[in-house]
UniProtKB/Swiss-Prot annotation:
<dbReference type="GO" id="GO:0046983">
    <property type="term" value="F:protein dimerization activity"/>
</dbReference>
<comment type="similarity">
    <text>Belongs to the archaeal Rpo11/eukaryotic RPB11/RPC19 RNA polymerase subunit family.</text>
</comment>
<dbReference type="GO" id="GO:0003899">
    <property type="term" value="F:DNA-directed RNA polymerase activity"/>
</dbReference>
<dbReference type="GO" id="GO:0000428">
    <property type="term" value="C:DNA-directed RNA polymerase complex"/>
</dbReference>
<protein>
    <recommendedName>
        <fullName>DNA-directed RNA polymerase subunit Rpo11</fullName>
        <ecNumber>2.7.7.6</ecNumber>
    </recommendedName>
</protein>
<keyword id="KW-0963">Cytoplasm</keyword>
<dbReference type="GO" id="GO:0005737">
    <property type="term" value="C:cytoplasm"/>
</dbReference>
<dbReference type="GO" id="GO:0003677">
    <property type="term" value="F:DNA binding"/>
</dbReference>
<comment type="subunit">
    <text>Part of the RNA polymerase complex.</text>
</comment>
<dbReference type="GO" id="GO:0006351">
    <property type="term" value="P:DNA-templated transcription"/>
</dbReference>
<keyword id="KW-0808">Transferase</keyword>
<keyword id="KW-0804">Transcription</keyword>
<comment type="function">
    <text>DNA-dependent RNA polymerase (RNAP) catalyzes the transcription of DNA into RNA using the four ribonucleoside triphosphates as substrates.</text>
</comment>
<keyword id="KW-0240">DNA-directed RNA polymerase</keyword>
<keyword id="KW-0548">Nucleotidyltransferase</keyword>
<dbReference type="Pfam" id="PF13656">
    <property type="entry name" value="RNA_pol_L_2"/>
</dbReference>
<dbReference type="InterPro" id="IPR009025">
    <property type="entry name" value="RBP11-like_dimer"/>
</dbReference>
Amino acid sequence: MRIEVIKREENVLEFYLEGEDHTFANLLNEVLHENEHVTFAGYTIEHPVLMARKPKFRVVTDGKITPEQVLEEAAQKIFDRARAVLEAWKEVLGE
């Protein structure tokens, strides 16, 4: 995964998330929407063949926190949820 910043303003961040597709992009988008400071979050894949693994994100906040802070919080939430799933599987498998 590689992040390429396209546009950065006070409360707006646009970036490509290279190496990912709808699977992770949709998860990130959903978690971003859980943050009360996010006024807009969305992504598009500009060309279904040429850019299939390069979603373009736009994140806008209310200005109380930066888009970078929102993304950091979202990444941590995704990590925590993945860890919870792993722990649940370990419990089921008796590990």
